[in-house]
Amino acid sequence: MIARSLPLQRLARKFCLVVSLTSILVHFGGANGLYAAQAQQPFAAFNLKVEIDIEDGEVEVWADFTLGAGSNGLDLPNESVSLEVKGGTGAYSVAIPAGSFKKDGSGRFTFQGTIDRVKLEASIRPLRDGAFEFEVETEGANLKGFANPVTVNLTIGDDGGSR
């Protein structure tokens, strides 16, 4: 498993992570038992920003990514979306089941709901030529124990990235 942990800068009671990558060669899985999804096709590019508010149980992730050359594309009606954010002794992970995202008139896929007592709002929007934008915001997650450095894993179907 290759996963790169990046230091964070503490801003009040929030952690903030900004990552800009042009290429990623990663294969990851459930080595720690928290992350069950396994990406077989690494993202070709993965840019990421994360904010964590421990006291309010909020995790916000903004990412844009480009599918790798071997990808068969995204099929959200038939593929689940898994996200894991961990650091220190804290971890938050969620799997949004296949078919949960609904497509709107602009081509954006959105999900609003509650999973494991945590409120979630998520969206995936196609940009251009295999590039996508991903956003998620949680409310009410147990984020006790979070500390630097933080690692983020995102998997959509068999495509994914880790930082």
Regions found by a protein language model. Name each.
Residues 14-30:
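Bacterial N-terminal signal peptides
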Residues 1-12:
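N-terminal secretory signal peptides that target proteins for export/translocation
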Residues 35-163:
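Extracellular glycoprotein-like low-complexity segments
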Residues 9, 28, 33-36:
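Short, intrinsically disordered, low-complexity terminal segments
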Residues 5, 23, 34-36:
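A composition/secondary-structure signal for short, hydrophobic, low-basic-content segments
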Residues 1, 29, 50-52:
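Generic preference for hydrophobic/aromatic residues in regular secondary structure cores
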